[in-house]
A protein has these predicted regions:
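Flavin-binding catalytic cores
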Residues: 165-167, 212-237
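NAD(P)+-binding Rossmann beta1-loop-alpha1 motif at the extreme N-terminus of oxidoreductases
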Residues: 1-52
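Active-site-proximal catalytic alpha-helix in oxidoreductases
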Residues: 181-224
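Helix-loop-beta segment of a Rossmann-like dinucleotide-binding subdomain
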Residues: 137-151, 199-208, 264-275
Length: 324
């Protein structure tokens, strides 16, 4: 299959690496600037942190997508806040099947903007974290998988087969769901409180107090209740029941949050991305606040944790200063 990975950040690089494990695939990455030069000269170098190994893949690159370029599958791994700038380019391209990978609170709107049949647009979330160094990607995962589906309906059999074929022979698990718009909004219910905590601790999760760790999960529970009030589908077994105080699911989540705060895995899986993607997190935060205006649900833990982080203006200035 001819496959394009549109975007060469951590998620796109890990995804391309997995797709290249299927030797029948011809994989191309869209990258720009110095990172494209690195990929062309040295290949796609990924340090798999948990596994203590480094992989190097040779992958073709492009820096623009022309309307007449055609691929069997296009995986878009741009941040949600960057999509408005690239959607016109993607819409004009003659490839049929697109998968938008990552946190996206506006899946339905993206699907509509692509002006294609709903069964030609999918949304996915890949379970890997990490950061990009000057010469390599550092990827943190304990096995990479993707939850994938249509915005508000299951993928067609043809689309499912195409996606499954792309990952044949790859060490990659696919989980198909029927409502990725709802799934992604539920995912933000946990991701955003975790980011608020990162910012409150200046990126050092080891400084988080027991009370703050508890607030993350209390806030996630409140967010799920808010989503229900906003008529967003919520899978209680996978979400609310894991965050409700006093439940077995909550005890497991308490242990997970503690591990993330006390081990380097938390830095690689949570802090690195939060601290390097402030603009994306602000975009997601504003989208979630927009959902809140549709309900009257009180979110005391959420607001308490959110108030402990610096303002978004301060966070952006810190990020800009660190990059100089």
């Amino acid at each position: 299959m001819r496959i394009l990975v549109y975007g060469a950040g951590v998620q796109g690089c890990e995804l391309a690496h997995r797709l290249l494990q299927n030797k029948k695939n011809v994989v191309t990455m869209l990258a720009r600037g110095e990172w494209k030069e690195r990929l062309d000269q040295r290949g796609l170098v990924i340090r798999h942190w948990v596994q203590c190994r480094t992989t190097v893949d040779r992958v073709a690159t492009i820096d623009t997508l022309a309307p007449d370029d055609c691929y069997d599958l296009v995986f878009v791994t741009m941040q949600a806040g960057q999509l408005p700038d690239v959607l016109p380019i993607l819409k004009q391209n003659r490839s049929e099947y697109f998968v938008f990978v990552g946190n996206d609170p506006h899946a339905v709107e993206v699907m509509q903007a692509m002006q294609r049949p709903a069964d030609k647009i999918a949304f996915g979330f890949q379970s890997s974290g990490g950061h990009r160094d000057v010469d390599k990607v550092v990827s943190a995962h304990v096995g990479v998988d993707m939850t994938i589906g249509g915005a508000t309906a299951p993928l067609s059999g043809v689309f499912r087969y195409r996606v499954k074929t792309a990952f044949e022979g790859a060490k990659y698990k696919l989980t198909f769901v029927s409502d990725m718009d709802g799934w992604l909004k539920c995912h933000l219910a946990l991701i955003l409180p975790a980011c608020y905590l990162c910012y409150a601790c200046s990126g050092d999760l080891s400084k988080a107090t027991k009370e703050q760790r508890g607030l993350v999960l209390d806030a996630a529970w409140e967010a799920c209740e808010m989503l229900k009030a906003a008529h967003i589908p919520v899978d209680d077994k996978e979400n609310t029941d894991c965050y409700r105080a006093g439940t077995p699911g909550r005890r497991k989540m308490d242990a997970m949050v503690l591990a993330l705060c006390k081990t380097p895995l938390g830095r690689l899986c949570v802090s690195d991305h939060a601290m390097h993607a402030v603009a994306e997190m602000q975009y997601l935060d504003e989208a979630f606040e927009g959902l809140r205006t549709r309900t009257s649900v009180r979110m005391t833990a959420w607001d308490t944790l959110r108030s402990q982080m610096p303002s978004w203006d301060i966070m952006r200035k810190k990020t800009a200063k660190a990059r100089r």
